[in-house]
């Protein structure tokens, strides 16, 4: 199993042959509740919370995709430390739509992929989910 990725991961480039193979391969979808995703991301991206000014400047990169009002709201949420609200809005209003569009256009088997749902993205929850996926994949 590999995670769906774009051609670039940070400053690294995924080799074309690997990317092409990934995009033609069978897919699975992991659907996590918004609450679980928010909690996971706040924990995983703690460095943004520790440096709100950096996050605020990063929000400016979205200026071609969202209104000035939306960006101002997100910056205010970051400035005031309203992390669950900010992360939830970024997921629902920005990331999710772009991600779905990218997956649908790049991964030929995405639409027909088996979905696995979870509301627990703790280490234990991810371990349980991984075991479910392996069992489901083994019996497929």
Regions found by a protein language model. Name each.
Residues 1-24, 29-31:
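Glycine-rich phosphate-binding loop used to anchor ATP phosphates in small-molecule kinases
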